[in-house]
Structures are given as structure tokens and as C-alpha cells.
Amino acid sequence: MFVCVDTVAVRAWLIPELERRDLPFIDCGLGLSLVDDRLFGLVRVTTSTPAVRGHVHAHHRIPASGSDNDDLYRSNIQVADLNMLAGTLAVIQYKQLRGFYADGEGEYHCVYAVDGNHLVNEDRA
């Protein structure tokens, strides 16, 4: 299941429910900040399966509390490319889990940073 919600409250309810039902899921999220009139952005893809779930809570990988102050996100239509990247990374992760694509790292958490054009893979199975 792909999880792409834009409110913390929905995510805080949905993630425990998926875990309770022992369902695998891939959660996507964006984080934006504005510094000197330039956008900084992070794209996050976090995978949780019945066999590998500890990282989600131990490392707070999926935001389940805090503010829904996303005015910056809602006011910047130009970040559609970041949404597309989140979706693309999630589909690639799904295909790796299903054995279609090779997965040499076995990561369950990936973050892309716009300012340095970096992909960081963590939480290996």
C-alpha cells in the first residue's frame, strides 16, 4: 500500500492501523523550508513490512506528531516535480520488494535533498 497523505493527524491514525493489520506499506512525504527566498526540500520514502518495522518508530521515520503548517507547500505549485519524485521512488522501492528490480542495499528509508542533489539510504533490512 502506498501512503501519501498531507496531514499529520491522518498519518498518525493510519500508520498504526496498517501495522495492527500487519500490512506492508510505503509512506512518502515532503519537507520544505524557505531560506533567502529559495526553497529547500526533502523527499522521504519510508517502507514498513511485517518483518521490518522497528526503524519507523525507533528513528521516528514517519511524522506522526507536530504541526500541519504546510502553507509553504500549498503556495508553491512548482514543487510538482518533488511529488513526482516521491511517487517514482516509492514505485521503485515496491518493485525492489517484489523482486522486479535488484536491491543491493535493502534500504527501508530513503531521503532526497534538493540543495545537494543527494539520495541517502538508511535502515537496511
Briefly describe each language-model feature range:
Residues 88-102:
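Oxidoreductase and adenylate-handling cofactor-binding alpha/beta cores
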Residues 13, 102-103:
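Short linear functional motifs in flexible/disordered or boundary regions
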Residues 1-86, 114-125:
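E1/E1-like adenylate-forming module used to activate ubiquitin-like modifiers
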Residues 104-117:
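Intrinsically disordered, low-complexity Ser/Thr-enriched
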